[in-house]
Structures are given as C-alpha cells and as structure tokens.
C-alpha cells in the first residue's frame, strides 16, 4: 500500500511511570483514579472500552462499548440481550475489557466472568437515558440483517407513535451486564518500550499485585 510506512509509525512514551509505592492496594481504587484523570483531561469518551467475547465457533469477537457503572461488584455496560454480544455472553459468560487512554499513554485490561445485572438496576438506568435512546432500544433489532436504513426509520416512527405522550418502559430484551473481574492489569507507557505493567489477580478473595515484563 502507498503512503506512510506502518513500520515507521511509533511514539516514544514519556509522560510518566507506574511505581508500586504510588499505586492503590485495590485495583478498583486504582482504576477509579485513572478514570477520573482521563475525565479531567477531557479525553473523548473516557469510559469507552473494547469488549471481547467468544462466538459460537469459539472465535474472539471485539467491539467498543461504554462503561456505565462501576462499584465493588464489577464493571457494568448495557446492551440488547438478543444482540450478537448478548447471545455470546449468555452462552459463554466470560469477557475481556480494554480501556485505552492514548493521551495519557495508559491502558487497562480487565478479565472476568459475566452476569446480567438485577432488572431493577437496568430499569433505573434505562429511565435515565434520553428519550431518543429509549426509543432506539425498541426500534433496533440489533445485529440482525435489515433491508435498508428506511426500515430502521420506519421502526422508530412506529415506536414513537406507540409511546407518544407516554413514558417508555425498558424492553425486556435490553439491560445490563456486569463483568466481575478476576484479573486487572494497568499499563503505563515508558521510553524505549520498557513499559510498566502491574497486574492484580484475585486469589481466595484477596487481590495480589505483581509486576510483569513489558
């Protein structure tokens, strides 16, 4: 391919390091610190993350989603349960997450088991969404083949009419998943590709931290 050589594209990471003495003892606390710093830096969609699942054939499948909840139980995102990722997570309830904050030269990897969140939590979040997003959850048969864009627009118009001047309930096929981590890795870019990698592993209910070679 013509253009700039991919082999020549590289940055030298110089913003900082990741030293054990400066890292929180609990990975959720450290993640919260980094997420708040990404928000303060006004990065675009700092809660965006790659979600990796397994297909029916056992192949890895990745896509970007948004983190919408975080507490001591895990990382929460919302989707159509009948979508490809929803069906994959139901069949194989394990997932990997990756957060990439390029401007801060940081990455976080999360591996864990997946569960559906309580319907009441999904109801509460759904009611906080903009009305257009609520209607979109009804109108889109996510991951299914549609004839054209007009089919989606017609679906949206139909649901707009049905719920005109009414509150919109959460579709039964839409809700949240929680990734319950057993491993969280924090990566900080460093010069000469000698990056910092600190990994937390959950063993017998306790988090253990170790340094990995880059």
UniProtKB/Swiss-Prot annotation:
What does UniProt give as the signal peptide span?
none
Q: What class of enzyme is it?
A: oxidoreductase
Q: Which HAMAP family match?
A: PdxH (MF_01629)
- Look up and give the organism this protein is from: Synechocystis sp. (strain ATCC 27184 / PCC 6803 / Kazusa)
Keywords of this entry:
Flavoprotein, FMN, Oxidoreductase, Pyridoxine biosynthesis
Protein name stated in the entry: Pyridoxine/pyridoxamine 5'-phosphate oxidase
Chain positions recorded as FMN binding sites: 63-68, 78-79, 85, 107, 142-143, 187, 197
Q: How does it associate, per the subunit comment? A: Homodimer.
Q: Does the keyword Flavoprotein apply?
A: yes
Q: Which reaction does it catalyse?
A: pyridoxamine 5'-phosphate + O2 + H2O = pyridoxal 5'-phosphate + H2O2 + NH4(+); pyridoxine 5'-phosphate + O2 = pyridoxal 5'-phosphate + H2O2
Q: What is the lineage of its organism?
A: Bacteria, Bacillati, Cyanobacteriota, Cyanophyceae, Synechococcales
């Amino acid at each position: 391919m013509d253009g700039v050589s991919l082999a020549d594209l590289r940055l030298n990471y110089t913003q900082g390091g990741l030293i054990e003495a400066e890292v929180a003892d609990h990975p959720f606390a450290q993640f919260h610190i980094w997420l708040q710093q990404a928000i303060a830096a006004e990065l675009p969609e700092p809660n965006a993350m790659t979600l990796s699942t397994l297909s029916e054939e056992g192949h890895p499948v990745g896509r970007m989603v948004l983190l919408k909840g975080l507490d001591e139980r895990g990382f929460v995102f919302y989707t159509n349960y009948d979508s490809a990722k929803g069906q994959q997570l139901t069949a194989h309830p394990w997932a990997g997450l990756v957060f990439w904050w390029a401007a801060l030269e940081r990455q976080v990897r999360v591996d864990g088991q997946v569960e559906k969140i309580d319907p009441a939590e999904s109801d509460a979040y759904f009611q906080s969404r903009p009305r257009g997003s609520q209607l979109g959850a009804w109108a889109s048969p996510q991951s299914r083949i549609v004839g054209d864009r007009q089919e989606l627009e017609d679906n949206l118009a139909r649901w707009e009419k049905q719920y005109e001047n009414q509150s919109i309930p959460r579709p039964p096929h839409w809700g949240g998943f929680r990734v319950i981590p057993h491993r969280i890795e924090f990566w900080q870019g460093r010069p000469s590709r000698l990056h910092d990698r600190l990994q937390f592993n959950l063993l017998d209910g306790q988090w253990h931290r170790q340094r990995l070679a880059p």
